[in-house]
Swiss-Prot record:
Predominant location: membrane
TM stretches of this protein: 10-29
EC number: 2.-.-.-
Pfam families xrefs: Scaffold, YkuD
Listed SUPFAM superfamilies: L,D-transpeptidase catalytic domain-like
Native source species: Haemophilus influenzae (strain ATCC 51907 / DSM 11121 / KW20 / Rd)
Family indicated by similarity: Belongs to the YkuD family.
Recorded topology in the membrane: Single-pass membrane protein
L,D-TPase catalytic domain sequence ranges: 254-433
Top-level division of the source organism's lineage: Bacteria
GO cellular component, one term: membrane
GO terms of molecular function: carboxypeptidase activity; glycosyltransferase activity
Protein name according to UniProt: Putative L,D-transpeptidase HI_1667
Amino acid sequence: MVVFKSTLKLSLFALSLSMMMSGCVLVGLSKNDQSKSLYGINLSHLSLAERKELEEAIYADQQRLTEEKQTLLNMTLTHEIGDHKLQFKPLLARLYASRKYAPLWTDNAAARQLLRDYAAMVASGISKSSATSLETLALVEQQGGLVYDVLLSDILLDYLYYTQNVRSQASNWLYSSAQYQAQQPENDHIQRWLSAVENNQLLDFIQSLAGENHLYRQTIQSLPMFIPTSKESNITQKLAMNAQRLRVIPDFHNGIFVNIPSYKLQYYRDGDLILESRVIVGTNSRRTPVMYSKLSNVVVNPPWNAPIRLINEDLLPKMKADPNYITEHNYSILDNQGNVVDPASIDWESIDNKFPYRVRQAAGDSALGNYKFNMPSSDAIYLHDTPNRGLFNRKNRALSSGCVRVEKSDQLASILLKEAGWTETRKNTVLASKKTTSAPIRSDNPVFLYYVTAWIENGNIVNLPDIYGYDRQINLAEINWDLVKKYLQ
């Protein structure tokens, strides 16, 4: 064992030199029992335990060498550009060393486009670190050279991670007080960037990262006109924040778009607006979620299965207070097997705030009205008709339990059922029968429930009430508006 230990130390020293010079990566030894030697070490006389010990020692030494190499690269980069704050210093140190510190940003148009888009993101106030990166770059812009190139690459990596993840992280970054925190982008995204550099396609690559929604583009383009000369920046930052919400929505070309605070549904086909309708959305305590889905089917004469929360909070107190409430509203009480339960058999006094049964309202006279438009949703959200038509005349229509009530549900159903092969006569016949009938959706009909309270359209500001308080929840960073305006123009 003493001989093995000495051999191991000498061999590790030799391996260290070899690894430092070649940058090789070692594979696991214990999985390759047929190996007779490794870098001059005779393995044939070693037990499995000794081989494992050798593997662990080599791995630890490799890790140490990797860390030392990274430290050396970091020091070299600092020597080249000075001690500037970078969000991705280790990655940039490796990248620029591999390129012998050749610049990546020789395309000035691409650099300007990146800074314009990045400044728009910074203006939203969702990231203090991004705001700091922009200010750091501005300090060295006149100096130019490698330091400017590296800082611009640092900004690109930040923006690249943001653009690749903002759609999936919108609820955290754009609708809550959680700050956006940059992470290293995935390697394939980094390689796309570097490939664009090598193929002189950097401007195209930067432009591909921008949002496609035309209201996003109009808002960003017009934003410099609304940047304040005083500290009164509320509307400017509101516009900038909502522009980022717009960037995750595709342009209005195909599908159903419901902007929750506008209480409006718009249905587009091939770029044409074919239906616009007032809607009712969830209350502040039962919010309609920001979500994306696709319509799956239309149900004519749908029954209504009351959500558990609504049963416990709304229906249960009414059913306990009035024995006739259930029959008057055409409700049925069902057990877990779907069997009808006689309300008279229930010991109402023993039930606290959790009703042990399901509640269903029969088709024809249900809270869903004549139509239900289903779509996959983890929150059991869907579009539907309503018998309470007068509610659509209210200015504040945040009145539902989360689902979206559509005023022109009959017109929407006619459009979708026609695509499913139904005639208007068949639709009316099924309606009159009060029989529940479902028709699958044949065409691709995405549904976007989104929340945007301010944007610029044709040069004019549209400013809506923040009905759910999402604008107020954002933990906004301090913005250098003069700097933002400089790069946005």
